[in-house]
Amino acid sequence: MGKLFGTDGVRGVANQGLPPELAFRLGRAGAAVLAGKGDRVRVVVGRDTRISGDMLEAALVAGICSVGGQVLKVGIIPTPAVAWLTRDLGADAGVVISASHNPVADNGIKFFSASGYKLPDPVEEEIERLVLAPEDNLPRPVGVDLGRVKEVTEAPERYIAHVCSTAGRGLAGMQVVLDCANGAACRVAPAIFQRLGAEVSLLHNVPDGTNINVRCGSTHPESLQAEVVARGAAVGLAFDGDADRVIAVDEKGQVVDGDVIMTILALYRQEQGGLPGGQVVVTVMSNYGLHQALTAAGLRVQQTRVGDRYVLEEMLKSGAVLGGEQSGHIILLEHNTTGDGLITGVQLLQVMAATGRPLSELAAAMPRLPQILVNVRVGDKDAAMASPALQAAVAAAREQLAGRGRVLVRPSGTEPIIRLMVEGPDREELENIMAGLQRVASGL
């Protein structure tokens, strides 16, 4: 990765690591690179509900217009909607201003190509080179050659209609609780599930700019679990701040994570005549129970490094149409080019409606090995990963679990965090191993 672009675009604390000056330069450089030698570049721009979104959007849009680019503003809208709208509106690129599930102080800028995919590394590197250049030699048109901004007010409705079009049946009578994380799903999620006929109840659907992801959404499903049980609902869906991921809750209040959702979707498609490509792409963090359930059904499981960009790369290479992460970031390539929590949620409820089976029963198809995940905040994640003390602790843990489980340690792609994972047959043993790893990592 370069100095600016990480695994998920450019991220930082808004107004510090990601100031409006940088957003302006990214707008200029991005528009110039993506325009190539063609006519005026047309760029879709959307954002989530963060308080810093107005500031960064204004700077980014100014940068695009300053090189003659045309901006199609779609407002507060999910990240996957920006990817889809970029293609639907025939734009040359899309940009979303969001830090997904990160805290409110953070924000990010992520580009999509005309085809709705994340930009290839060489294109990001060229944008970064221009942004960091000592002199700005990009065009500065004047008069009628300046860019314009168009508000695309129908954008949310276009995306809502697209998501609903992926459903083969209605959801009449199904009680659904939606946790919108006070984020980008707040407008579109209720409309989608109500249009499909579900009886919808809402949690965390009143964004104020500062409450996005705060004790809610896919990273904090506790209140959704309680609400599903209290209402006697069939299912709950928790999105993150930009709705590119979703976690479900069954009728008993139990969390159904991305591994289980992928298993349910894959097994249903296999039963209905076969999953296109015959395989599912997951990361090394996926529970081994997923591998057991899918291989028993005759499906292949491909593993990648952690990160949706690596999942997508393998999907495109292998012809898979389903892939994703335990976190609920699931890519359904038949419907969108990136992880889409709304489409994933609709497809999960389609399986429930088609089979007439409760979610808890569908989820039981995946046996689950005990797995413990812990995030440890560190000063320098690269230095921490290279620490002899941590490496020795990991080696000892792996030796203890040899042949019976797994130990994974990796740096976050977007935060100063080391992620620890242990998996095996005995939870008490795993807790002891994790306590030792966490003690070492916390001291780095």
From Swiss-Prot:
The modification Phosphoserine is found at residue 100. Its cofactor is Mg(2+). It is an enzyme of class 5 (isomerase). It holds the Pfam family PGM_PMM_III. InterPro entries: A-D-PHexomutase_a/b/a-I, A-D-PHexomutase_a/b/a-I/II/III, A-D-PHexomutase_a/b/a-II, A-D-PHexomutase_a/b/a-III, A-D-PHexomutase_C, A-D-PHexomutase_C_sf, A-D-PHexomutase_CS, Alpha-D-phosphohexomutase_SF. It comes from the Bacteria. Catalyzes the conversion of glucosamine-6-phosphate to glucosamine-1-phosphate. This is Phosphoglucosamine mutase. It comes from Moorella thermoacetica (strain ATCC 39073 / JCM 9320).
